Amino acid sequence: MRIILLGAPGAGKGTQAQFIMEKYGIPQISTGDMLRAAVKAQSELGRQAKALMDAGKLVTDELVIALAKERIKQDHCRNGFLLDGFPRTLPQADAMKEVGIAVDYVLEFAVPDSLIIDRIVGRRVHAPSGRVYHVKFNPPKQEGKDDVTGELLTSRKDDQEDTVRKRLVEYHQQTAPLIDYYRKEADAGNTRYFTLDGTRNVSEVSAELAAILG
């Protein structure tokens, strides 16, 4: 079972990725994880990636694809894998296809930008414990304070509205074209494409995923 998750930041991909990993026993593969593992293992690809990063340069699509190909050959990916945040661009998707990385399911989590902004901007965290609240959807018992310690809650820098809006613009420019790409791939019989309504509660989305994936 080889799966790609698509959706804007805040669309709920991370939560559902966890559900898929636990239910189906397949590993999640992210670009960051692949790079860190390759650098740590000091493989040839890892050394190339480290040289680029040390020089302050972006790791090339070719190198990322090569890392992905190397990673999915490993034993723990024998039953499949879950790609989150990759491919991010059309050239990456094309390159994946060219090197023979097949995908069984592409799952898109659709959520309007206005709700994503609401979801992210309203997040509050208790930094020492990692507990997360939301001013509207999961408020603390006492406004602005952690339920357990009573300490003040804070907003992450990445959760500021202007930052979220910038990330959404970037998503629509770079990643949204993948939606058309994979819909066409599904029409051609190369994968199966499903759009899930990410505005629903977590358990409803998980139930639909279980019905799709079997």
UniProtKB/Swiss-Prot annotation:
Functional description taken from the UniProt entry: Catalyzes the reversible transfer of the terminal phosphate group between ATP and AMP. Plays an important role in cellular energy homeostasis and in adenine nucleotide metabolism.
The UniProt record lists the keyword Nucleotide-binding: yes
Assembly behavior: Monomer.
Pfam families for this protein: ADK, ADK_lid
PANTHER family: NUCLEOTIDE KINASE
Region of interest called LID, as start-end residue ranges on this chain: 122-159
Key word Kinase present: yes
Protein family (similarity comment): Belongs to the adenylate kinase family.
UniProt-recorded name of the protein: Adenylate kinase
Organism: Sodalis glossinidius (strain morsitans)
One Gene Ontology MF term: ATP binding
GO cellular component: cytoplasm
EC number: 2.7.4.3
CDD domains noted in UniProt: ADK
Pathway membership: Purine metabolism; AMP biosynthesis via salvage pathway; AMP from ADP: step 1/1
Chain positions recorded as ATP binding sites: G10, A11, G12, K13, G14, T15, R123, V132, Y133, R200
Main location as per UniProt: cytoplasm
